Amino acid sequence: LHAARADTEALTRVYSQGTADERRAVLYALPHLVPGPDALPLVEDALRTNDTRLVAAALGPYAARHLDAHQWRHAVLKCLFTGVPLDRVADLDRRAGGDQELARMLADYAAERTAAGRPVPEDLHRVLALTESLSPANATDDPHGKES
């Protein structure tokens, strides 16, 4: 894909018509081939699937740069729901740092799991700790970051 200098249209075609392996290859190539947010629909599609390999591939550096706060928070929760290790989420430390809305969402999820007698994923505690530190990226309020 990189050698072919595939544009967003070509990447979309390969992703849409490709196998799971080809879709993952497209997602991994995005940060190297698409400088702006034009390929976000591919990331969003992968995050809607139940294929944990696609979800993990979708959360690379491209998503870290281009997903808005709302989408990114829900992607982190999807990882917890589906068992995708949060080590696969690019730029997790920076994006989670100081994110009080993510902290609230994580606490709610942990409470639901506990009330249902289910274990709370270990990754949740690590990310919750990250939300307690202030990151420069989250030092100012994001008008679109508030969940409803």
Residue spans for each PLM region:
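Alpha-helical scaffold domains
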Residues: L1-S148
